[in-house]
Amino acid sequence: MKYFILAQILFLTCLVGFAQQVMLADSITKNPVSYATVYDAKGNVIGRSDMGGYVNLQKGHEYHISHIGYAAKSFVYNDESIIFLSPSSYIIPGVKVTAKKKKYYHCKVFFRSIEHVDSCLKYYMDGIREFYIDTKSKKVHCGNVVTNYFMSKRKDIAQKKRSMMIGDKYMALPFPDKNTLYEETMRDKKRNIESGIVYADSISIGSCEVYPDKNEMLLSIDALWPRNALVTNLFGYTQVLSKHNKTELYRCDEFHAPSVFNLKSANSYRHLTLTHKKENIVRDIDVEDVFYVVEFKYTDTKELSSSNVLQEDYKKYSGMFPVIERIREQLVREE
C-alpha cells in the first residue's frame, strides 16, 4: 500500500512540473496569436508561440508575454487551455498629407533589441531613430539616432570568459525595408493569403489579421521559408539560424495596400546556435528586434532632428512602450 501511495505522490509531482500546451488567442476575435515572446519570472526567454498560437507553460509558474500587436500580459499559469491577449492601440501623431505630394516621408521610431544567450538575458539596446523615405523610389535615408546600450548585471553572464574569439552580439539598429511583408507576399506568385492564413506552395507559413474597427492589419510570417535552417561557416565557426519570424502591423484602408508609409510597428525574432569545430562550446542565442513608429510627416526637405530633441523623444516614448520589469531590473548601462 505504501508503495502505491508513493507512486501516486510521484505521479502528481510529475504532473505539477509537466509543461502543458496552451493557446494564446486574441481576446476579441478569438483567433490564435502567433509569434508572441514568452518570458519566465526572471526575464529569461522560454520560447515563442507557434503559428497556431501554441506555447508550453507549467502550472504555478509566472510568465510575461510580449507582442507588438497586443498589450503586455503578466500572470501565473493555473491550468487554462487558452490565454487571451488584448489588442493594443496607440495613436501616431502624424501630419495629414496635402494635395501636393511631398518628396519625403519623415518618421521617428522607438526601438529596442533584446538578446538572450543560453536563455539568459545578456544584452539590451533601445533608442530613437529617424528616417527620410523617398515617396517615389521608397529609398530609405537614415537620419540621426539616440541609442542606449545595457548588459546583464549577472557576472556569470556578463563576465563569462569565452575561448571563442567571435563576438556574440547580434543586436541590430532598426531599418525599414523598401517593401513591407505584405507587398512581398502579394508579389510572390508562390504565396497567397486566404481566410487569414499566409500560404506558400499550399503550406501555411504565417497569418494575417485585419482589424476593421482600428483600420489595422497584422501580418506574421516564417521568414526562413522554404529553408528549415540557414547555416553559415566561417573560420571554424558554424552559425545555424533555425528560427526567423517577422511580424508587421500596418495602418490600412480599403483603397491602398499596406506600404512602408503605412507601417506602424515591426518585430523580428531570430534563434541561432553558434559552435566551433575544435571547441566543446555551444551558444544558443535568441534575438528580438522591435520598433514602433511614433511620429511621421511628409516634407520636401531633410531637416535632421537635434540630439536634444531625440533625447526628449526618448524620454517620452520609452514610457509609452516599457520593457517588462523583470528585464529592466537585470540591466546595467554598458560602459
For each predicted feature, which ranges?
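Short Pro-Gly-centered beta-turn/loop motif in secreted/extracellular proteins
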Residues: 30-33, 54-62
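Short, acidic Ser/Thr/Gly-rich low-complexity loop/linker segments typical of extracellular
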Residues: 44-52
